[in-house]
């Protein structure tokens, strides 16, 4: 569960290393790209949710710099994810992928496994870039 002030690792090569959640959006990918539903008042973000975040640590020559405000989709959480078949999955750390306003990743690679729930939320580009989908 990600809430404002939570810090997440960045699982792509956009240049950011760590981000801090500022806001959790009511969001998803609709027919015309990213839809945020006006921000909403969700308290927690789970896998597949979109957050607004501030870049806290960044690589020197990356596409994003420290202090930038970006949108990101949560791809891994340390809080267990319950699935319809009764199984649960959890990851060691919280991680996110930085996206643009159309819901596409800003980086060209995704590091580490991502949860299968991203496919249900229609983040197909992130799923295809990931080395493993759990």
Curated annotation (Swiss-Prot):
Domain of life: Bacteria
SUPFAM superfamilies the UniProt entry points to: Ribosomal protein L14
Transmembrane listed as a keyword: no
GO CC, any one term: cytosolic large ribosomal subunit
Keywords: Ribonucleoprotein, Ribosomal protein, RNA-binding, rRNA-binding
Entry keyword Ribosomal protein: yes
One matching Pfam family: Ribosomal_L14
PROSITE patterns, sorted: RIBOSOMAL_L14
GO molecular function terms attached to this record: large ribosomal subunit rRNA binding; structural constituent of ribosome
GO biological process terms, semicolon-separated: translation
Biological role: Binds to 23S rRNA. Forms part of two intersubunit bridges in the 70S ribosome.
Record family assignment: Belongs to the universal ribosomal protein uL14 family.
Assembly and interaction partners: Part of the 50S ribosomal subunit. Forms a cluster with proteins L3 and L19. In the 70S ribosome, L14 and L19 interact and together make contacts with the 16S rRNA in bridges B5 and B8.
Protein name in UniProt: Large ribosomal subunit protein uL14
Organism: Deinococcus deserti (strain DSM 17065 / CIP 109153 / LMG 22923 / VCD115)
